[in-house]
Every structure is written in C-alpha cells, then in structure tokens.
Amino acid sequence: MKRILFSLLMVLLAVPTFAQVDKDHDFKAAKNMEIFNAIYKNLDLMYVDTLDAEVVVGNGINAMLRSLDPYTTYYPEQKMKELKNLLTGKYAGVGAVIRYNFQLQRVCISEPYENMPAAEVGLKKGDIILSIDDEDMTNKEVSYVSDHLRGEPGSSFMLKVKRPSTGKTMKVKVTRRTIQLPFLPYYGMLEGSIGYINFNSFTEQSAKEVRRAFIDLRKQGAKSLVFDLRNNGGGSVTEAVSIINMFLPKGKTVLEMKGKLQRSNHVYKTMVEPIDSVMPMVVLVNENSASASEIMSGSLQDYDRAVILGTRTYGKGLVQTTMDLPYNGQVKLTTAKYFIPSGRCVQALNYKHDKGGYVEHVPDSLTKVFYTAGGREVRDGGGVKPDVEVKPDSLPNIAFYLAGARDSNEVMLNYEVDYIAKHPAIAPAKEFSLTDADYDEFKTRVLKANFQYDRETEKYLKDLEKLAKFEGYYDDAKAEFEALKKKLSHNVTKDLDYNKDYIKHLLENDIVSAYYFQRGAIQNSMRYDKQIKEAVKLLNSPSEYEKILHPVKK
C-alpha cells in the first residue's frame, strides 16, 4: 500500500524535464506538492479511521483533473478496460442495451444487437434479468448488472430471465464475445438517386466501412448523398481524416493541432485521391455532433464541399492524448486545440485555469470571422453552425414522460412487449405503422394506469402565481388565475389525442427495433424525419444547392 501511495505521489510531484517553466511556476508546483504530501502523511498517521490510500489519493487526483476540463481523466489499472472500450468502441459481453424497469424494480433487456449473443440465445425486449450465474439481481443497479454481463471473450455464464408477456422463466447459457458497437447501423437509398449513410462513431475500422457503403451506394445509382452525423460524439481523428479524404482532393489540409509542446502540433492532410470530389452532399448535424464529427462537417463546409444542415454542433475543439502511468494506469489529458481548414477552432467553452477557475461560454459577439475556400463567411467558437438551420420537432412533455423511463407503471414498455408477443412478424421496417385501433388500445392503457406527468404550462403558472403573491398582485388577479388553472389542468385524453402522431411514431420505432434491430428503427423513423426531408428537398433542387455553396457575390 505504501508503495502504491509513494508512486502516486511521485506522479504528482514529477515535473517534466522538457517543460520550459519560469521559476515562479516551478516554486508553486513544488510548494503545493509538498503541502499535499504533508497533508496525506498527517491524515495517514493521525486520522481516526484507517485510510484507503487508493481511494483517498484517487479522489484527490480526480478532483484535480475535474477542475481542468471534462475530458482529462485518470484511469487506474482496474479501469483500463473502460478506456479501451472508449477508444475502440469494443467490449466483451452479450451485445444488448439494458435499462431499469421502474414498475418491477429490476433491470431488463431493452434492445439486443443484431447477430450478437443476446439475440442469438433468444433474448427479447422487456425480458427481466433474474440472476447471472445464480447470483440474484434483485434491487441491483444497471451498472452492477452490466458489469456482470461483461467479461472475457469466450467465457460463458448462465442467465435466468423472465418473459413478462408469458410470465415464464427461462435459463440460457450465454457465451461472451467481443462486441463492436455498430458505428454504421444503416445505409441505403432514399427517394430517386439519393444515397444515405447513418454514421454514429469514428472508431477503429469505421472509415473502411464508410468507404464500402459509399461505393455500394454508387453502384445502386446514387448521384447525391445525405451523410448523417447527428448524435455522433466523435472518436478517432485519423478515421475522420480518412473519411473526409473520400470527398476532398489529395493534398488538402483538413486539420491542424496546436498545443503547448512542439510534439503536440500536427497537420493532417488528405493523402490519397478521393472516391468522389463532386457528388452533391448534405451533412446532417445536431447539438450532439462533436469532436471528429465537427472536424468532418467543418472541413467539408470550409472547402464548400457539402451543405451542412440541422442545428449547431456541440463545440468540442480540444484534443486528448493518453499517457502511461506507473502501475499500469493511464491518464487521458487535453494536449491541444484543433483548427479546421479556414483557421477557426470550434471550441464552445473556455475553461479558465487562473484564480478560481471557471467555465465560460464563448458568446457569438466575441467570435471571429473566417472564410471558406469560396469566400463564404463562417465563425469560430460555438461549434459548426449549419448552412441551413432546420430544427427537429420538439418532444411533447407527455411523450418525454412516457418514453423517458419516468413512468412507474411502464405503460409504453408493457404495451410494446405485449404487442411483440402477439405479432410473430410485422411489415417491413420502412412500411410498418400502428393502426388507429392499436393506438386506441395504448391510449386506454395509459388512462387505466392513472398516468401522471408534469406539464410545462402548469409549472410556469405556479411560478407566476408565486411571483404575483410576492409582488402583491395576486388578489387583484385571483379570478383570472383560477380560470387559467381550470383551463390548463391535466387532461391526459386531450394530450394523447393532440400528440397522437408523435407518440405513435415513438411506439412504432421501438416495436420495429425488436424485429429489425437498429437498422430497422432508422428506416422506420426516416419517414417522419423533418431534417432528412429537407436534405432530400435541397438535393432535388440543384439551383438552391449551388446558391448556398456558391452565393452570388454582391
């Protein structure tokens, strides 16, 4: 234990020989490390209870790193698998999404992945996990169950589940294997000659899959492309550059990294000839498109190669590097900022590290103007702003509570599980839809369950009422407040009818995924996707497309 503590303290005390620091900084570092060392020695010697060095010092390390930014993280030896999963998108397990069932207060199967162990042994949406290798999973959290489902590739365990639709329990032997999270869950043709690629993670080998998908789409007759980066949180920079290279000529600068040290600086260029540098493209982005997604969308925007459509991206312009530590740990730390071809950095938050460090959002008024290759104006900070802003439909409050696992009766999950049990097969994914009678049955279930949820109008009315009382105006407007309360009181039937289409689409999407997995859910949802519809509309109008990328200069 003392050896572990000594090693951890030496890591903290170490000052890189290559760092060019002034004497004041050097003194402050040595002084505070000495204080830290002295504090822990006194704690270890005098504290009333015996301390766990790994826990106490580990908490200190984590607190220090949290004060810098959300991406700088310490991974001790026992968490190295977590880091590997993050970097590769791979883990050893059963290949299924699990969730907590609030009605039964147990963890259940939410979505088995296609061609993975969970699906192959017959596990279905809603199956309740009772035990793993005879260890009872009652009252266990999702993270606990997840840890027990994972293990070494090739290892087997006995899984006991209960199927809610029949009430029967079943015991199956499951063999874990390496699971590659689907980074390209679906690609195919939209209307006419428009190809579509749904891409959700820049992990190892993902560029090869995108290349294969794009070539296949061209063989199918694709003359234009919708490339969907919505909810893609990023990943490998090299994979991003390889994908960008499919659409940009050889020799183009895509990315420049700039850090404190010379070795952190790097320029990425397209290295080979592209597959297609002229095909019209629309790239879809949203607020969850981050990092490598912003490198790709921003680079294509800066070279006027594609129209970016959707909502402003996340704004992560920082680069992380992993470094080895003693005792087989690693630290993932921010070592550079990246700049896309126009010279801008998309970082939205400024992490201040001076006295009393704080986080500051870069306001639009302080952003700088940059220019694309064709002279269009773009700005730094705050992510990549789309050329065409199209906001998705807002999630109705009742749908949020039904689908957001806040319903203690689990009305939506139970309806879906029962529907799946009654229907061995359904229509093809892109054609499937629930009938009005199906929705009426769901509506009846919701009403019988005495479903409760908060309405935003009621919440704001209560806040307004409190404010009126505080300022002394409530008595004068009491009658109006009472009338509004009656008008805005809960009417679940009305809300279910008013939001029928949206809720129906949520149900259809969940049900389809049980038969056709993630690819089917994507196909089904595309029928109602406002942003995809706008992308198709734009690609079907070459003059509008050209007007955006090459506007007439005044």
Spans of features found by a protein language model:
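Conserved functional hotspot residues or short segments at active or partner-binding sites
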Residues: 345-554
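Cleft-lining beta-strand/loop regions that shape enzyme active-site pockets
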Residues: 18-32, 36-53, 76, 85, ...
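PDZ/PDZ-like peptide-tail recognition elements
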Residues: 71-111
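Bacterial Sec-dependent N-terminal signal peptides
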Residues: 1-26
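N-terminal, post-signal-peptide region of Sec/Tat-exported proteins
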Residues: 44-82
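Polar, glycine-rich mid-to-C-terminal structural blocks
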Residues: 292, 304, 311, 315-376, ...
